[in-house]
Every structure is written in C-alpha cells, then in structure tokens.
Regions:
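Flexible glycine/proline-rich, aromatic-decorated loop/lid segments
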Residues: 17-39
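Alpha-helix initiation/capping motif
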Residues: 12, 26-29, 160-161
Length: 192
C-alpha cells in the first residue's frame, strides 16, 4: 500500500497475471499496472524493457517527491525474478548487503518439494504445460505433471496434430493421461 507506482514486467499476459496474483493486485488497481504502457506498447527495444521501466519510474518519482515505485522483471520461463522498490526519498538507517546466504539457502533447500523421476510410467495428470511452436504452427507440448503417487515428471507430447490442437484450444491443467518413456524421452498422452 506504500507503493504509488507499479510496473509489472509484461512479456506475456501470463507474466502480468502471475505477478498480480503473487502481489494480491487487482486488474483495476487505481495505480495502474505499468508506467510505460507495457512491453509490447512502450516504443523501445524489447531487450531493454526493464531499464526503460526504471527510467520512466524515476521520472514519475522525481515529479512526485516522497513517493515509491515497484518495478518487476522476469526471465527464462518465468523462473528468474527481479524486483526493485524505488523512491526519491533518501534511505534512512544503515543498509547492509547480506554476505552469508547460507541460512537462506538452507531454508529453501529444506522446503517440502515433490519427488521427481526421470523415467515416469503410468497414469498421470498435467500440473502445468506449454506448447512449442514452429513456423508451421504448434510443434510439440511440454508437460510438467504428477504421477498418481504425487511424483513429478517432465515429458513431451507426440507431434500429433489433434493433441496439439486440443492443447491450444483447451485448458490442460489437471488433464489425465498416461506417461511412459520411449528410451530417449518421456511421452505424455492425454485422455481427451
């Protein structure tokens, strides 16, 4: 609530939706979700978007002394996150960068996580997925799923046009199927 301006990284709608959910923001937040207009629309080079969002944020903060702004960034498959809180108000107190991250890493390492198998077999369901496209259209699906016992796995779909069409036009989350290995890779076959 102390943040006056927000710029959520916006490479895809899902990146904005995930950030909104994690920050408990509503799509009609009166502060807006971007100070630039969003990555596809701001008029600058895409590979320097966050630099531009920070620069735009600084202009807003300098025009409204004492306010705060949040700019976020992410990369890869939304697995690398960055966030910055900015203000024209000087920092008060002593700032120290953490030099020993051992305790933090130990806490992360001890968090409960599912077992993982590289050779899944049997009935399974989709936990999350994406569709890889080529110039000709959908090429294959990538599935992160769970076996019946909760073990997590990674698999591809076959290059079956009907499966890919189904994946493009339906929500595959929690879809049941069967997963097996063909010796080179894991294959998930949904039950449609």
């Amino acid at each position: 609530n102390q943040v006056n301006y927000i710029d959520l990284y916006s490479c895809f709608p899902s990146a904005v939706q995930i950030a909104m959910r994690e920050l408990s923001l509503q799509k009609d937040d009166l502060r807006g979700l971007t100070v630039t207009g969003g990555l596809p629309y701001f008029g600058g080079p895409g590979n320097a978007y966050v630099m531009n969002s920070i620069a735009t944020m600084m202009d807003k903060l300098r025009s409204n002394r004492g306010t705060f702004g949040l700019a976020t960034a992410n990369g890869w498959y939304i697995t690398k996150h960055g966030a910055g809180i900015f203000s024209s108000k000087p920092f008060e107190g002593e700032w120290n960068q953490a030099t020993d991250t051992t305790q933090l890493q130990t806490k992360i390492d001890s968090a409960k996580k599912p077992n993982f198998t590289e050779s899944p077999q049997g009935k399974a369901s989709v936990e999350t997925y994406t569709i890889v496209h080529s110039r000709e259209g959908p090429n294959k699906g990538i599935i992160i799923g769970r076996l019946e016992d909760g073990t997590r796995f990674l698999a591809n779909t076959e290059k079956d046009p009907s499966v890919l069409d189904y994946m493009c036009n339906n929500d595959m989350l929690k879809t049941s199927g069967v997963v097996s290995t063909d010796g080179k890779r894991n294959i998930f076959k949904p039950i449609q």
